[in-house]
């Protein structure tokens, strides 16, 4: 009887797959498929980003792809008015015919309620390799759109050419969310993580990748270029620390199997030298960081989500109590293939995770997983 119960428990635990409840942990984890490849009108759907508006609406973004990383890619979205329990149908925010519209990076201005969405564009005929090696017709460029009605409608996207230096080729905003600073001399600043390749090379070369910062001090009316990080850094995520500084956590090409990190004391205009965080083991992949609670409100908690080990699998949530210095708490959320992710704090105090997961490939679905902080801590 004991063996049967043990085996049955393992089977139930394994059903974190799609649209089911994970039993055995006080019903604190739920998974919904929001986008599924070859079912929801696109052959592939990737690159999740999510935000919660000032009114509490959830906006889940992704790239709707005709094929892979190049070609006809639309920027798509689903909305939830009830904290992620139910969702609207798929809405297309930007479709530029056969061209590539992607890399969503939303940030909510809590002073004005405006949702700003940074994104990128390139010709659909141009691959990342062609763009980086100078064989494309155009480099990749940053754009912005916004919504003043809780994500119901969006302004026509506008190019931001001044945010790309002359020699830069590849360009990517996020993917994931930006933040608004809440304390210190730069309170109110909108901060967007981004990355680029800094020159043309004969072949695609990871040494040309650099993370950087985009920011706005006037509620999105204008955008400036902040700090540029050291080489071998790429897709990144940002979090505000308790003293008002900004931590940028970056995909690393240093070959050490962990994340690159740097901290800014001036809101992202300059950073201390990059260091490799031995406590954050991760494959070469996008990841996400989220401020869950502040020291003055119960306890400092910063969350981090990413695959673990050397492959894109084992989506894991980690927790830091000391402003990202150490990560003593870690639990796996999805054991199978998984890749890009983005977290959001929900109105009911739980955490929402928009993530690429599947049974045999990370790119089968973009799913919305909710979990309770008590489950993570116990």
Identify the role of each PLM range.
Residues 1-4:
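Positively charged n-region of N-terminal signal peptides that target proteins for export
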Residues 23-378:
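Asp-box/BNR beta-propeller blade signature and adjacent active/binding-site loops
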Residues 8-20:
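Bacterial N-terminal signal peptides
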């Amino acid at each position: 009887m004991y063996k049967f119960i043990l085996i049955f428990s393992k089977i139930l635990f394994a059903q974190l797959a799609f649209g089911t409840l994970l039993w055995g942990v006080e019903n604190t984890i739920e998974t919904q498929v929001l986008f599924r490849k070859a079912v929801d009108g696109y052959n592939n759907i990737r690159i999740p980003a999510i935000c919660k508006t000032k009114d509490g609406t959830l906006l889940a973004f992704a790239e709707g792809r005709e094929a892979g990383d190049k070609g006809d890619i639309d920027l798509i979205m689903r909305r939830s008015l009830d904290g992620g329990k139910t969702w609207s149908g798929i809405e297309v925010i930007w479709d530029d015919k056969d061209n590539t519209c992607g890399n969503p990076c939303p940030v909510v201005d809590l002073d004005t309620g405006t949702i700003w969405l940074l994104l990128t564009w390139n010709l659909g005929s141009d691959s990342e390799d062609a763009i980086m090696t100078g064989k494309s017709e155009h480099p990749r460029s940053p754009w912005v759109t916004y919504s003043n009605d809780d994500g119901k409608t969006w302004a026509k996207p506008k190019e931001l050419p001044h945010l790309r230096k002359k020699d830069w080729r590849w360009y990517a905003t996020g993917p994931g969310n930006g933040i608004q600073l809440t304390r210190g001399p730069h309170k109110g600043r909108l901060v967007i993580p981004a990355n680029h390749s800094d020159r043309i090379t004969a072949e695609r070369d990871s040494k040309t990748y650099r993370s950087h910062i985009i920011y706005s001090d006037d509620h999105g009316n204008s955008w400036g270029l902040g700090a540029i990080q050291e080489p071998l850094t790429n897709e990144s995520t940002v979090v505000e620390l308790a003293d008002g500084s900004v931590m940028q956590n970056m995909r690393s090409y240093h070959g050490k199997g962990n994340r690159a990190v740097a901290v800014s004391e001036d809101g992202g205009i300059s950073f201390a030298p990059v260091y490799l965080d031995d406590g954050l083991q991760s494959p070469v992949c996008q990841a996400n960081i989220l401020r869950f609670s502040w020291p003055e409100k119960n306890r400092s908690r910063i969350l981090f989500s990413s695959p673990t080990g050397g492959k894109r699998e084992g989506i894991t949530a980690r927790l830091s109590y000391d402003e990202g210095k150490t990560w003593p708490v870690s639990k796996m959320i999805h054991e199978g293939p998984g890749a890009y992710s983005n977290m959001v704090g929900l109105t009911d105090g739980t955490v929402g995770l928009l993530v690429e997961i599947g049974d045999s490939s990370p790119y089968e679905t973009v799913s919305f997983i909710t979990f309770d902080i008590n489950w993570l801590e116990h």
